[in-house]
Amino acid sequence: MEAPVSVPRHATLVERLRGVHLEMVDAVLGGDGLGRVAELAADAAGSDVAIVVPRLGAAVTNPGAEADLSVLRRYAGERGKERPPGVAAEVPISSGDEVIGHVLALGEPEALTEDALEFLHLAAVASLTEVAVEEAKEEVEQNLRGSFLEELRAKPDELDPHEVVRRAARLGCDLARGAVVL
């Protein structure tokens, strides 16, 4: 993983946006997750940030932020509900026409910098990337499970029992003590 891109505060807005965007993408693809994205967004926007993605079961804030994540989860899950107190601004995380989560600036609206929303939008794009990565991992895992089960069904006598136990364990299933299939 590369060293983080450090963007000075005196850089132009475009330079700051580009640098923060690269850091967010690096965080997602490097496996640092939405917590790191929230931290980067908070630092760039100058306010605490929460990211809530119900589809992933994720609700995170930057370190040190004070927020009731259960309230933010409910808010993100119940679209159209009144914005909870302590949420200064929000940007939806959208996939096509579907809103799958929110990036929330925490605090008072008056305290937000004029370019804070730009950084929240970057966090929304990075969050969407995280959703795509997680869903791709899940799909690959499902395909591996399906092909393993098909192989067990099609040629049960040709497979080495130790290999079956090993492969099942890699897919999260402990067959070391045996199993019964109905």
Role assignments for model-derived ranges:
Residues 1-182:
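Hydrophobic, helix-rich cores of sensory/ligand-binding and other regulatory modules
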